[in-house]
Amino acid sequence: MPISKTLPYNAIEQIKSYLLQLQNTICVSLESIDGKTRFHEDSWQRAAGGGGKTRIMANGNVFEKAGVNFSHVSGEQLPASASAHREELAGRHFSALGVSLVIHPQNPYVPTTHANVRFFVAEKEDSEPVWWFGGGFDLTPYYGFVEDCEHWHQTALNACLPFGETIYPKFKRWCDDYFFIKHRNEARGIGGLFFDDYNEISFDHSFELMRSIGDHFILAYEPIVARRKDIPFGNREKAFQNYRRGRYAEFNLVYDRGTLFGLQSGGRTESILMSLPPIVHWEYNWHPEKGSDEEKLYTDFLPAKDWLKKE
């Protein structure tokens, strides 16, 4: 007998409860790491339906800017970014819940990171609801360390293994493909996990997978921050960090599905654009010095690779 993909009557309540708990857990952990600054919470309502809680930290000891956003929005019609390739969604009203975060550190030796877990459901009278989960986490170093990349991907693998051996390679490859800046012909970072439109086996199975990925994020990021946050740096490293942040801004404004969905669905602009770095620098036709640590980011870390392959 096949396992049903029927949506439980209290699915939204289950997911919302988990997401709020995840937001709080991550914020408490980041406050503990920073040791100086606490998150400011900004609750907001969306006129077309729903709302959220945006938490922002700025000018901390460790984190220059960190945003952890919970949103639960609804509407009568999905925006183009969510329905362009799914004709069955036409004419359905939707609910979308998620936690999305971006962390921009002070120290250039600490990587920037992004994570997101989300749920969509599109419903229509006299029809089965169409639902799916999505999310992932990815790492954007400025100065690469092999042990950090290996730890990041090992933790990503650990999040996926309970659901089968094929999940991590699939989601890892998806992440490498998704976070690629086409107009620059380079990756945004060293990847991690990315998945979308996931509703395999059953609701419970899919929800458990999303929770596992959400719960493993801080386990992946916290040890890297602890190792790198006190490394001395100077103007050169800070300038390179600000230059590379430009790539981050370019990707988010041109390609990111979450940004496009939020703006097209009439979301809250301040919360949607919280992912942008506080300071960014563009320099015309800049190239790193040969043999420098900055060049190694491009040659040794940004090209997609299997970080867990044992030689």
From Swiss-Prot:
Species of the source: Legionella pneumophila subsp. pneumophila (strain Philadelphia 1 / ATCC 33152 / DSM 7513)
Subunit structure: Homodimer.
Residue sites binding a divalent metal cation per the record: H104, H114, H153, H183
Main location: cytoplasm
InterPro entries attached to this UniProt entry: Coprogen_oxidase_aer, Coprogen_oxidase_aer_sf, Coprogen_oxidase_CS
Disulphide bridges: none
Active site: H114
GO molecular function: coproporphyrinogen oxidase activity; metal ion binding; protein homodimerization activity
GO BP of this protein: protoporphyrinogen IX biosynthetic process
Role description: Involved in the heme biosynthesis. Catalyzes the aerobic oxidative decarboxylation of propionate groups of rings A and B of coproporphyrinogen-III to yield the vinyl groups in protoporphyrinogen-IX.
Enzyme Commission code(s) on record: 1.3.3.3
Pathway field: Porphyrin-containing compound metabolism; protoporphyrin-IX biosynthesis; protoporphyrinogen-IX from coproporphyrinogen-III (O2 route): step 1/1
PANTHER family (UniProt xref): COPROPORPHYRINOGEN III OXIDASE, MITOCHONDRIAL, OXYGEN-DEPENDENT COPROPORPHYRINOGEN-III OXIDASE, MITOCHONDRIAL
Identification of the protein by name: Oxygen-dependent coproporphyrinogen-III oxidase
Family indicated by similarity: Belongs to the aerobic coproporphyrinogen-III oxidase family.
Residues flagged as site, Important for dimerization: H183
GO cellular component: cytoplasm
Cofactor section: a divalent metal cation
HAMAP family documented for this protein: Coprogen_oxidas
